[in-house]
Design a protein with these regions (language model features):
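C-terminus-biased signal that marks the final domain/tail of proteins
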Residues: 1-320
């Protein structure tokens, strides 16, 4: 089963007699009634009493993120966004691969009814055929800020509907944990770590046996710009790319795909090399190899994102 709870109350009814499946404070019902959150007559629903709805004010026990992911993994259930509740978890229609999870964390709902750029069209003329076509504006991107959204909707009401994306630019980091119990612990567990916007940044494999990480990983860059903070190794290129996302996204997406394929395709080598070193030189040397591999992989991604940042600055030299 797959469950999603993205900063929202998802729990519905409570059966505290079923101690194997439910646990709550003894006063969970009485406090709700005392505070006027529940009238004591209609069936008690935790999310309705203590939350009332999602962060857009809709009286639901879910938001677009929960709906989109659960529906993507179990389309046979025919879940509806118009529902008041969705299942806490669903059984996927087919096995979920680590790449499926990575792809879901990159979601901006492009090409769906939830796509925030769907109405931002411009007419372009083909230089060769002289025919005019309508495309999404190169200046449109799914991570537009409040000022831009207000301006667009001020020009024409309803141009852009704000939707909470899975991938957001204010993200500090995200990770996908892959566990494989048939391998030695040191290589069986892998954390695929990404910094900044998961819709634009690469994932770095960190194995369970890794004993140290590059110094930049330990420095926060969320509150100010810091060249020594890992998040800013990617954020500069990512932010610049949104200036004309229609022109830059292919390059960003290509780099993300390259490192995803690189990490996955090199895993058998890493696993075998770890075992060889463990047998010949001991556990400490084998773990040092894993540590070095992650550092080298991270370094390669950093270099590529720095190159793209330089390229984007040059691309926009005449103005944004």
């Amino acid at each position: 089963h797959v469950g999603v709870s993205a900063n929202i109350s998802r729990i519905s009814t409570l059966d505290l007699k079923d101690k194997d499946r439910y646990m709550a404070s003894e006063n969970v019902f009485s406090v709700a009634k005392k505070m006027g959150f529940w009238d004591g007559k209609e069936p008690f629903k935790f999310w309705k009493a203590y939350s009332g709805g999602n962060y857009f004010g809709e009286p639901k026990a879910f938001s677009i993120r929960e709906y989109f992911i659960l529906n993507a993994l179990a389309p046979s259930l025919k879940l509806s966004y118009d529902s008041e509740e969705l299942p806490i978890s669903v059984k996927p229609d087919k096995p979920v691969a680590v790449t499926d999870v990575m792809a879901l964390l990159r979601q901006t709902y492009e090409g769906t009814e939830w796509d925030m750029t769907k109405n931002l069209k411009v007419a372009v003329k083909n230089k060769e055929t002289k025919e005019t076509d309508t495309i999404t504006s190169p200046a449109a991107n799914p991570w537009m800020g409040t000022d831009m959204l207000n301006m667009l909707n001020g020009v024409k009401e309803g141009t852009v509907t704000r939707n909470r994306l899975v991938a957001v630019p204010q993200c500090s980091y995200s990770h996908v944990i892959q566990l494989r119990n048939w391998l030695p612990d040191a290589v069986g567990g892998v954390a695929w770590l990404s910094f900044d916007n998961p819709g634009q940044s690469p994932r770095i494999p960190i194995f369970s046996g890794t004993t140290d990480l590059p110094a930049a990983f330990g420095i926060c860059g969320q509150h100010r710009h810091r060249e020594d903070a890992i998040v800013w190794k990617y954020r500069t290129a990512n932010k610049l790319a949104t200036v004309r996302w229609g022109l830059t996204k292919e390059k960003i997406n290509g780099a993300v795909a390259h490192f995803e394929e690189k990490g996955l395709s090199e895993m058998p080598f890493v696993e075998n090399r770890y075992k060889e070193l463990q047998d010949s030189k001991g556990e400490e040397t084998a773990r040092a190899f894993l540590t070095g591999y992650t550092a080298d992989f991270a370094g390669a991604t950093i270099l590529r994102w720095q190159e793209m940042a330089d390229e984007f600055w040059k691309m926009f030299a005449r103005g944004f």
